[in-house]
């Protein structure tokens, strides 16, 4: 994976995390209730899932594609 693509994906996942965190914070601080989304716990659960998925993707990128893909070909057999 080239550096530009890696940087764009990293920023994308980081922005997804920040967006979800901001929405959770808004629910919490402002007691926002959206008429079509009455299930606050369900909405927060969905936002937490978005955070978890984005963090997982960042972790996979770090594991397999950081350091110019040097480690992506190294697999250990247990």
Where are these regions (language model features)?
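Extended, charge-rich alpha-helical interface modules
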Residues: 1-78
């Amino acid at each position: 994976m080239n550096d530009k693509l890696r940087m764009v994906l990293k920023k994308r996942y980081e922005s997804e995390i920040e967006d979800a965190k901001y929405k959770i914070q808004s629910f919490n601080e402002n007691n926002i209730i959206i008429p079509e989304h009455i299930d606050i716990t369900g909405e927060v659960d969905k936002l937490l899932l978005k955070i978890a998925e984005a963090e997982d993707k960042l972790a996979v990128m770090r594991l397999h594609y950081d350091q110019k893909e040097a480690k992506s070909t190294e697999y250990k057999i247990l």
